[in-house]
Amino acid sequence: QVERAALDSIRAIMIIRAYRIRGHLAADLDPLGMTDRGNHPELDPVSYGFTEADMDRPIFIDNVLGLTHASMRQIIDIVRRTYCGTFALQYMHISDPAQAAWLKERIEGYGKEIAFTREGRKAILNKLVEAEGYEKFLHVKYMGTKRFGLDGGEALIPAMEAIIKRGG
């Protein structure tokens, strides 16, 4: 009994870590729903030895997701909403443990999902479209001139605006 509980705890922590590292592979990134997100084997509880009969048994996870005990069903629900939704965060590449812990504390657990209002989403989209349009304008106006574009950094535009608004 003790050995099974210890093994369940270790396997539960392993699957939580797998979602932290690989959850983006199952993220909902297709707003039109035209592609299948698929199932990644590293994110499947069966790969860690859990069966359907194990899904509702309480497992000690030592406050890892803000809970002392949780069933595998609860754990999967939390990590899927945190790391596989339409807005997800990756932080496992951050080498400073304090910075990674700061992010983890704010996103993991019940009620900590990041959700934008409809107006907020529109505002972010508007800023992205403005930035992309401005970059295209510069490309046409100053063709051949060396410049630095937004390629891959477009998401920084609404983030910088939010930082300026909050700090100013």
What are these regions (language model features)?
Residues 1-156, 164:
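Extended, charge-enriched "interface" segments that sit outside catalytic cores
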Residues 160-168:
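Glycine-rich phosphate/diphosphate-binding loops that line cofactor/substrate pockets in enzymes
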